[in-house]
Curated annotation (Swiss-Prot):
Its EC number is 5.3.99.2, 2.5.1.18. Bifunctional enzyme which catalyzes both the conversion of PGH2 to PGD2, a prostaglandin involved in smooth muscle contraction/relaxation and a potent inhibitor of platelet aggregation, and the conjugation of glutathione with a wide range of aryl halides, organic isothiocyanates and alpha,beta-unsaturated carbonyls. Also exhibits low glutathione-peroxidase activity towards cumene hydroperoxide and t-butyl hydroperoxide. This is Hematopoietic prostaglandin D synthase. The gene is HPGDS. It is found in: Cytoplasm.
Length: 199
């Protein structure tokens, strides 16, 4: 088993999908959390100057979704066939495209709040409708077992619902999928013990 070290801020953010995958697979890793004040000093030492990064026996992988895809493949959560893997990737990329619309780093709180409200009110319904249609009456987004696409929906929707609690009320199937993910024993245990952070 390789030695894993995941480095990110003390947030769920873009590293949480990786933490879900580690938790579900029962893989030991170092969850290294940076404090914001330390970032200017550390940033020049990080490849491409962004986190998260995953060190695998000293080899550094950057980009959160590249890390997550690697972990999903290693833990059997990428999809059972090449087509399933492509579909799971497509769902993750669709959700990620939406999450990238938000001005997460905006310092002006009025500007940030207005932008968030606009996205959640005017753009989120289309995403939720499309995800609901894709899920249909299936238990999981892709195939007959859970994949990292289901985890990514749970991770991202947790953040979205913290900003607009009734966001998915019209989509009980998507909410039920969240419940199924969070009922998985390893995920439930991780959610219970993880540090409580805003995002």
């Amino acid at each position: 088993m390789p030695n894993y070290k995941l480095t990110y801020f003390n947030l769920r953010g873009r590293a949480e999908i990786c933490r879900y995958l580690f938790a579900y697979a029962g893989i030991k890793y170092e969850d290294h959390r940076l404090e914001g004040a330390d970032w200017p000093k550390i940033k020049p030492t990080i490849p491409f100057g962004k986190v998260p990064i995953l060190e695998v026996d000293g080899v550094i992988i950057h980009q959160s979704l590249a890390i997550a895809r690697y972990l999903a493949r290693e833990s059997g959560l990428a999809g059972q066939t090449p087509v399933e893997q492509a579909l799971a990737d497509a769902i993750v990329d669709t959700i990620d495209d939406f999450m990238m619309l938000f001005p997460w780093a905006e310092k002006n709180q009025d500007v940030k709040e207005k932008a968030f409200n606009d996205i959640l009110t005017n753009k989120a319904p289309e995403l939720l409708k499309d995800l609901d249609t894709f899920l249909g009456d299936k238990k999981w987004f892709v195939g007959k077992s859970v994949t990292w696409a289901d985890f990514y929906w749970d991770v991202c929707s947790t953040t979205l619902l913290s900003y607009k609690a009734d966001l998915a009320d019209k989509y009980p199937r998507l909410l039920a999928l969240r419940d199924r993910v969070e009922a998985l024993p390893a995920i439930a245990a991780w959610i219970q013990k993880r540090p409580k952070t805003a995002i």
